Amino acid sequence: MCSIPLSRPRVIKHVLLRAACLCLGATSCFAQPSFLTAVASTPYDLQMTPVARVLTSSAHPLPRRTSLGALNQWLTNLRAIPYRYSTQWKTPAQVQSDLVADCKGKAILLYAIMRANGATHVRFVIGKHHVADQRTHAWLEWDTTSGTYLLDPTFNTTVERVSDYDPARYIPHYAYNGARKYRATYHRPTYASIVASN
């Protein structure tokens, strides 16, 4: 590698340029994940009509701190619900009364539970559980100051960081954050620690 000495003005310009890039990168992480592009609609919108109100509901007016212990308990309880695929999207009330659900129903119910308990920055995600899967899968991602957590009540009983996953797993296609809709433009960076505004 060749190193060329920089004059004092160039060093200052170089340092300022790096600082500006760092600041811009830091502020953009508070908007939405860089791998998601806002869209007006998704191919799932019509199918999701029964659960649209759940996704656009406000968080509990008195924000409470959602503990990882509580999340693990919710995941364990939802994981225990027998899996049964449904072509129809079930509301949280339907999942609770039927006591069977697919990944969509379990993830929507967890989304509703988290919002009712004051959690913000929660995304409902549709994508692939594994890159080779033929069918899509649904899960949640929760952005916190400690990092982004992956919440999958179909397969997991504990909270895990997105950054801990193999890039060939949990590949997002579309995401829903409140009334906002996103399309994934490329695979999630493995180092993502993003706080979305909601």
Residue ranges of each PLM-predicted region?
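Bacterial N-terminal signal peptides that target proteins for export
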Residues: 4-20
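A structural boundary/capping signal
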Residues: 2, 6, 25, 29-198
